[in-house]
């Protein structure tokens, strides 16, 4: 694995081509991550199900805003999606100027922070959605998914995009680190 | 900000000193992260509270294993802690050989994965502990912390170490990336 450390100057054109490839892959992964976080936020944000007779005295309408963890999920996915859109110009700049150093460092640190944010959001939402599906006998929390069938399906589905974005952000950090190491 | 890109060869001794400083800081942060994840896992894992008459027919004993999210918290913090201990020799090697490239790349990708793991664990546990404290009126989940006072305090407290480790791992990724960029 250490063979790449010798003769770096003689392989400059090849290295540059690979760096450009890495930068293009970075851009593609970023676009996919934008789509998946945006889809997650929209899918969760637009979920609602009205149950006319859930309790005898109120009309029950289930929305994401009823559960704080799902609200956090929508907000966090929107933030990550906005950040990823803002990072696209920088990613395009890296294709043109593949030796950039400080801008890649900036991307790595923000990508890591956004990785933490999107992971926190998807895992808090997962904990709550899991509870909605299964309930918890010891804590006496009942599963609410028998009543709220389509609500539970939509919320479960919208987790997928967020977990996808998590994996993509780990890959993006790896790509940026590889680009830094290749210089 | 781009001024560092010129005259890199002439500043080699200074750069090496800074790189060594970065590597030492990396080691210190790793040790702190080991302690905080280990403390979190132990604090959560040893929590239990017995309520003799919570319900009239069973003796209620609250443990972390009653809630899947808290079990995940203990497991994930143990894994991250074990990984961080295993990464210490590599971190020490970086102090001696500050120009290392591939081993830093390996550390960055594993640090990013462990960041995702510890964030997922702490945020899922936070969602459940928050629910235990506040309950949720819409889903008809009652707050269980009135009865389980010391259980709730211990579990809330053990979240701190995990969130600390999250911040430390973001800093570790930044330090590794900086070391790669400085080479």
UniProtKB/Swiss-Prot annotation, chains A, B:
Source organism of this protein record: Triticum aestivum (Wheat)
Superkingdom of the source species: Eukaryota
Residues exposed to the Cytoplasmic side: 1-23, 93-104, 180-183
Protein name as it appears in the record: Casparian strip membrane protein 2
Stretches in topological domain Extracellular: 45-71, 126-158
InterPro entries, per database record: CASP/CASPL, CASP_dom, CASPL
Glycosylation sites (chain numbering): 48
Residues that span the membrane, as ranges: 24-44, 72-92, 105-125, 159-179
Biological process (GO), any one: cell wall organization
Keyword line: Cell membrane, Cell wall biogenesis/degradation, Glycoprotein, Membrane, Transmembrane, Transmembrane helix
Subcellular location, record wording: Cell membrane
Pfam families assigned: CASP_dom
Predominant cellular place of this UniProt entry's protein: membrane
Coiled coil: none
Keyword hit for Glycoprotein: yes
Function: Regulates membrane-cell wall junctions and localized cell wall deposition. Required for establishment of the Casparian strip membrane domain (CSD) and the subsequent formation of Casparian strips, a cell wall modification of the root endodermis that determines an apoplastic barrier between the intraorganismal apoplasm and the extraorganismal apoplasm and prevents lateral diffusion.
Membrane-related topology note: Multi-pass membrane protein
